[in-house]
């Protein structure tokens, strides 16, 4: 890691494979991927299921955990390639939002979009269509610009996480594979196109 400049916003460089932060660390800064790619890993079901996503520049990192009741990172982040990170202190973020209405509006729009995910997801989880559960999980736990989304799993743990019997889960995965929405090798699900999964399985009126 290399600290390039000491100013209200800091630029840091990470080499491929370096840890940027770990799940559970305090969100002391608003961070952005400004060059390269970073890989986020979210541990689920006691760590037996791992959701992996690639964050590609330019993108913001978990700003909805900067303030509020939970101010720790929900995932671990490592540099997937040589990666540039810009970080701003919380105090500086507040000062920007107080002085710049466009920045304030952008932040409110981002937070509102993420808050509305919960409403959509809860309604879908209550529906009788169990095929939506995988889409809901991906929808909730990944960013709308995330790429190379993968889920590493053991069958019993993924069944538990989705609340499905083994036969129902295998049928779901087989159906999604047939439609080209996921690729599966028995221990890892690959989701080539997040938008396709969300558009097909999480939409009003389905």
List the predicted regions and their residue ranges:
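Polybasic "coupling" helices that flank or enter modular domains
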Residues: 80, 98-163
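Glycine- and acidic-residue-biased ligand/ion/polar-headgroup-sensing regions
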Residues: 28-41, 57-58
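Phosphate-/nucleic-acid-contacting segments
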Residues: 141-206
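A short beta-strand-loop-beta hairpin characteristic of the jelly-roll/cupin
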Residues: 38-50
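Cyclic-nucleotide recognition modules
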Residues: 51-109
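Short phosphate-coordinating micro-motif centered on Lys-Gly-acidic
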Residues: 19-26
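A cytosolic small-molecule/anion-sensing beta-strand core signal
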Residues: 15-16, 34-35, 56, 81
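Cyclic nucleotide-binding regulatory module and flanking cytosolic helices
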Residues: 1-16, 60-61, 65-69
